[in-house]
Amino acid sequence: MSKKVAVVTGSNKGIGFAIVKGLLRRYDGVVYLTSRSEERGRTAVSQLKELGLNPEYHQLDVTDRESVLRFREHIKRSHGGIDILINNAAIANSAQLYNSHEENEEIININYKSILTIQELLFPLVRNNGRILNISSDCGHLSNVRNKYWIERLSRQDMTVNDINEFVEWFLKESRNGTFKKEELADDATAAAYRVAKVALSALTMLQQNELAARNISVNSMHPGLVRTDMTQGVGFYSADQAAETPIYLVLDAPQNLKGAYVWFDRKVLDWYDYNADYYFKSKTLNG
């Protein structure tokens, strides 16, 4: 019988690196550290080997279809499938709370559109009874959206990926045209593209769960808390190792029937649809 396989995208540093480290200490199987930059990935692998841990490594740029295809072929050839897939590769809004259109496009591509590619190319490799975890954010709760039309469309029981994609494209069009209004999103639309991407990802998670339910694969999204990483410029309440605890719980210990959920860093399952809730990201928390 082939060994079980866990894959963590964007895992050469921060939460992803901490998740790989935690899995290597607990998971009875192969754990893949992946990164866009092979050099940085190999450095991260060396750091883990110094701790007596032994990850596998493969280059993976989630925004590059050819890179994802190469990774897919490697996994098929070497292992035949994946048992745990953690979609962690992400980029925030750099140091600014407001961004140029080009930055907005990059943020959307990495945090949302790349997941569509992963879904198309890697989800078929996830074995029956496997687990998929999308690392979202408090920016990913529906309460980040203030536009009533989009709240309604994203709350529909018959929501499709087309609804989510149109939400994302609406934002990009408004951004490109300079017509986006700050009242469309919470907190004066700070980190707007990141909010839009993570809301889209959290919504997509529920559709992914529906598609994979017949194979008893659990798909969840989660907010890891404000973590001290490069992405938050070192601001945060938790270390990366602490933040990795709930993601590791969700893929190793949570009941298999926890499916399609939006989970907070304290393992509490939240009502994602409660758009009046106080779960949205507040930029003042970045002031430490």
Task: Please tell me what each predicted stretch does.
Residues 1-32:
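Canonical Rossmann dinucleotide-binding motif of NAD(H)/NADP(H)-dependent dehydrogenases/reductases
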